Amino acid sequence: ILRITIKLKHKQHWGHSIFYVGNNLVIRIKQQPRSLLLKDLTIAIDAGHGGTNTGAGGLTGVLEKNITLALSLKLQAALEALGTKIIMTRTKEEFFDNKERILFYRDSLPDLLLSIHLNSSADPIRTAGTSTFYRYIGFRPLSNAIYQRMLELGLTEAGNNGSFNFMLNSP
């Protein structure tokens, strides 16, 4: 077993990725951007699911993939109106598997990734609500701020959850 410790100069990193390029192991550590103004950020928006991956089905028969795409396109328009550079996983109805998503984000280097999903439950009458998920502890305040704004819409609380592993096992 080989153990490598990397001591960082900055207080909090904005994520990391570990991957191979040929026989080389690459460790990329992301730092906070100099400016946190929306006009200075690059934000990736992932419209969850798509194509043959329909996601959750609602009581009315509406598919998650359609709602996530519609919400993502509205979010794209709102953020672009504020001057934010947006990178979209998909802008139309198509399949985009998780491996493709991981490679897409790894290569495009967004400052933030917002992945839009809706969940289902075996008992949708009793189990409902909105939640946010973040991967790195440094993103908890941002995730919580988004969560609090969502609650202002009158949505039921389902929590701000950490250690979300969307890219944890990336190639």
Where in this protein do the model-derived segments appear?
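Catalytic-core environment of secreted peptidases
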Residues: 35-61, 114
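Intrinsic disorder/low-complexity detector
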Residues: 18, 24-25, 55, 167, ...
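Signal-peptide-cleaved, periplasmic/extracellular N-terminal interaction regions immediately downstream
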Residues: 1-43
